Structure formats: structure tokens, C-alpha cells
A protein has these predicted regions:
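Generic structural signal for short, solvent-exposed loop/turn connectors between secondary structure elements
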Residues: 10-14, 129-132, 205, 215-219
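A long, glycine-enriched binding/interface module in the latter
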Residues: 189-289
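Extended, hydrophobic/aromatic-rich amphipathic alpha-helical segments that build helical scaffolds
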Residues: 1-23, 52, 118, 163-200, ...
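Alpha-helical junction/boundary sensor with strong preference for TPR arrays
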Residues: 26-27, 204
Length: 303
């Protein structure tokens, strides 16, 4: 996590140092999971892919540490599981559903996001769902990534036992490759960066990249920006990634242009727009008052 923090600070020397300390333990403490779905299955809780994750225990109803979790269950369309009893009480959250409060960018399911043959696509999202008996609903997409109960099959929506990842070893390695690219693209491309990229691609069922595929430092970064999108989708790290790359405003402009309720037909422009100050969250008033000193703690600009 310290290595990730240094990445957010653009301190690539320190990031490479601390991420490298983790990679030095590959084979003993850490390694890439053999299959992408193993990164999320309860069968591999606390495995070598899992650097840090929230702990859960399947088969017990509850939402506290050490008990089952309901996070996975919220992604199941109830009409697909009517025979499961409690499942039918909650409808699965589709990430392009009617509620704007839960709407995610449809760009994750768009054409050209995943390379042809990338196993991660169908292991991450699913569409063409039979939400009724008449016909499949091709325009409905559900997150599949966290529906991984190999050991303890849940009998209720909140009885899932698969741990929720906070930091995966794949993330450590891709951040390390990115840090090395920022430090010295020419020196590290063939010896360190390319092997990491290809290890992740191999697991996804994709062919290896060559040094000639990356003409310069920017080409590597462009690849990693897209690769992190498909590898870590729905894991909660895309936003801080976009912030540190200074791509958040561009990404949100694209997002707001895609969602129906965010589009003004009169002006033919998105109704909503991210402001530059939104890159930082507002500081709670209670924290500001606790210090009572503007030189120590004050509100971020724009709020």
C-alpha cells in the first residue's frame, strides 16, 4: 500500500523501491493467480494473489468482519434465481440500469475495450440475460466478477464467503512496471516491463507483446492505462488511477455524454461536468473545526 501511495504522489523512485520489495518475495509469499477467476473465488481466499483483502466467512448470515458478505449477492438478477428463495427478494444491480445513482460507464462493455479472445471479458461482465421468459435482454449488463463461490455456495443473498480484494499482486506488478517506465523506459522495457505485461496477458489468454509494440514511454503508459481498466474493473481503483494520470476530467466528460439523464438534447451537450476541484474530496467540517487553524487544516479549493 505504501508503494501505491507513492504512485499517487508521482514518486516513482520510492514506488519502485517498495513495490520491488513485494516482488522480491514472489514464489514464496506472492504470485499471480493461475486463472483470472481465482483472483475472486472463495476457494483461493488469502492465496498468493491476494496481498490484502477484506475477510469473510461463507455460510453465516451477516455483514461484519469474519462473517458473510452481501456485496456479491447484489449483482445477481433475482429472476435468474427464483428457486433460491431469498435471492428473489433482491434484484441484481445492472451497471447500466435505470438508476443513475449506480450507473457505471458503459465503456467497459463497449466494442474494442477487450482484445479478441480476452478471457476477462466474460469473467467480469455478462449480458444477454433472460430476465423473463420471452427473450434475452441484450442491453442489460451485470457484474460477474465477484460471483465466485466454489467452497461455500450461498443460500441467501448475504451469505457469500469470497473475500473482497483491496490490493492484488497483479496490481503490485503492473504498478511496478509503470514506475520503471516512468524512471527509465529504455533500460527496463525488455528486462522488466515487458515480462510483467506478458505474464498478465498470458493469463488472460492473449498473445505476448514485443518490444517493437512500444515505441516510447508514452506507448507503454497508454497500454497500462487501458490494461488496468480491464484487469481491475469494478475493484474500486479506477478513480484514483484517473486522478493520478490527470485523466479524470476527460473520462467523466465521456461518461456524462453516454448516460441518458446526463445529456441535454437542446444544447447537445452533457448536462453534468466534472470541475477541476472535484479531483480532491471536501474536508469534513468537523476536522477543520478540530484544528481551528487555517494554517494547519482548511477546506480544499472549490468547496
Amino acid at each position: 500500500m505504501l508503494g501505491r501511495t507513492y504512485m499517487y504522489m508521482h514518486n516513482y523512485t520510492k514506488a519502485a523501491e517498495y513495490l520491488g520489495k513485494v516482488i522480491e518475495q514472489e514464489g514464496t509469499l506472492y504470485e499471480l493467480a493461475g486463472k483470472y477467476e481465482d483472483c475472486f473465488s472463495d476457494e483461493y481466499n488469502n492465496g498468493k494473489e491476494r496481498v490484502w483483502e477484506v475477510q469473510y466467512l461463507g455460510g453465516t448470515t451477516g455483514k461484519a468482519l469474519g462473517l458473510s458478505q452481501s456485496f456479491s449477492g447484489w449483482f445477481i438478477p433475482s429472476t435468474l434465481n427464483k428457486e433460491k428463495g431469498d435471492y428473489a427478494k433482491l434484484n441484481g444491480i445492472t451497471f447500466n440500469g435505470a438508476s443513475s445513482s449506480i450507473r457505471a460507464s458503459m465503456s467497459i462493455a463497449g466494442d474494442g475495450v477487450y482484445e479478441t479472445g480476452d478471457k476477462r471479458r466474460d469473467l467480469t461482465i455478462v449480458n444477454n440475460l433472460y430476465l423473463d421468459k420471452s427473450a434475452p435482454q441484450a442491453d442489460v449488463y451485470v457484474v460477474r466478477k465477484f460471483l465466485r463461490a466454489a467452497k461455500n455456495a450461498p443460500t441467501a443473498v448475504d451469505e457469500w464467503g469470497n473475500n473482497i480484494p483491496i490490493l492484488r499482486y497483479t496490481d503490485v506488478k503492473l504498478m511496478y512496471a509503470e514506475a520503471l517506465n516512468e524512471l527509465d523506459y529504455a533500460t527496463y522495457l525488455s528486462t522488466d516491463i515487458l515480462p510483467i505485461i506478458n505474464d498478465v496477458r498470458k493469463r488472460a489468454g492473449l498473445s505476448a507483446k514485443l518490444s517493437s509494440d512500444f515505441a516510447d514511454k508514452q506507448a507503454v503508459l497508454d497500454y497500462l492505462v487501458k490494461e488496468r481498466f480491464v484487469e481491475f474493473s469494478f475493484e474500486g481503483i479506477r478513480w484514483p488511477d484517473l486522478i493520478r494520470w490527470d485523466l479524470a476530467e476527460e473520462a467523466m466528460a465521456t461518461h456524462f455524454a453516454l448516460v441518458d439523464e446526463g445529456y441535454n438534447e437542446t444544447t447537445e451537450q452533457p448536462t453534468y461536468a466534472m470541475k477541476s476541484y472535484n479531483k480532491l474530496a471536501p474536508i469534513p467540517l468537523s476536522d477543520i473545526l478540530a484544528y481551528g487553524n487555517k494554517d494547519i487544516m482548511w477546506q480544499n479549493d472549490g468547496y
